[in-house]
């Protein structure tokens, strides 16, 4: 029996390796259909160390400020990651989400309903202020946000988890109506999610990997409360939800009268809201995905299979980095592109 246990223990990593290899394309990324993932539209526009000559040390400044902030408040990591995600899915990664509304003009993205719970903007403001004093009119808000999101997640690992290609400029248009239309909803089904991601040049593997960002952070019960107490309008619970997890969520989200308390919060990953690891996927495969959009991943065979592979933290972290590089390159504006600028203040166009 001891020999058999030893054999299984050594065999499991080999099996996992073979599964990952089967899903990999040239060792560089997953693909849903066996074809090599084509390089992003940003290639040739962005590059590593873009500010090496124009603002030496800019990326170090971003990292130092972000790590200091996250060390003091670990909840900032998911907050900054979410701001970056919400920015990129509307008009691309152009920092349009950072713009405040201006009287007499259209309401900005920041005031769209899906963005009302976002926070962490003041950290981007602080970084921008320091970089403007050091290198005026040089480092874009879009690049600052992209770097800050990466560094916030990377803090616990004490090293960058993925490369950030820089050289973005900032957009001048920000519309709440576009945010309401383009941002994936926590209540979306798989078909809707796949369509929205495909429109941004992201495939099923990216969809699953980026959903893994839910391994950190919290959510208000009002966002998913219908799954618990009124799934079909008859006071029932979503049958796809793990019963024990549903009971736990009801206890956390209900007031003394057993009614939903929409302002109550729970960790998005039941294994813990702080560690950036594969806990989200381990829980998901036990039907403990918090949102309808999480559970939706299990309704598609390819997505469910990818999620099962991502129960291995190494496989998840590697692909998450690749998918973040793709996401952070959606519809980027660079120097010379119409409609772009280097803002002096991330909240206002020049």
Curated annotation (Swiss-Prot):
GO molecular function: heme binding; lactoperoxidase activity; metal ion binding
Cofactor(s) this protein requires: heme b; Ca(2+)
Disulfide-bond pairs as recorded: 55-135, 88-93, 141-346, 221-253
CDD domains: secretory_peroxidase
Gene Ontology CC terms: extracellular region
Record-linked InterPro entries: Haem_peroxidase, Haem_peroxidase_sf, Peroxidase_pln, Peroxidases_heam-ligand_BS, Secretory_peroxidase
Residues noted as binding Ca(2+) 2 in the record, renumbered to the chain: 215, 269, 277
Compartmental location: Secreted
Keywords associated with the record: Calcium, Disulfide bond, Glycoprotein, Heme, Hydrogen peroxide, Iron, Metal-binding, Oxidoreductase, Peroxidase, Secreted, Signal
Top-level EC class as recorded in UniProt: oxidoreductase
Protein induction: Up-regulated transiently by a cold treatment.
Naturally occurring in which organism (per UniProt): Arabidopsis thaliana
Catalysed transformations (reactions): 2 a phenolic donor + H2O2 = 2 a phenolic radical donor + 2 H2O
Entry's cofactor comment: Binds 1 heme b (iron(II)-protoporphyrin IX) group per subunit.
GO terms (BP aspect): hydrogen peroxide catabolic process; response to oxidative stress
Protein name, per record: Peroxidase 24
Site feature (Transition state stabilizer) residues: 82
Role summary: Removal of H(2)O(2), oxidation of toxic reductants, biosynthesis and degradation of lignin, suberization, auxin catabolism, response to environmental stresses such as wounding, pathogen attack and oxidative stress. These functions might be dependent on each isozyme/isoform in each plant tissue.
E.C. designation(s): 1.11.1.7
Binding-site list for Ca(2+) 1: 87, 90, 92, 94, 96
Glycan-linked positions: 73, 189, 230
Key word Transferase present: no
Signal sequence, renumbered to the chain: 1-27
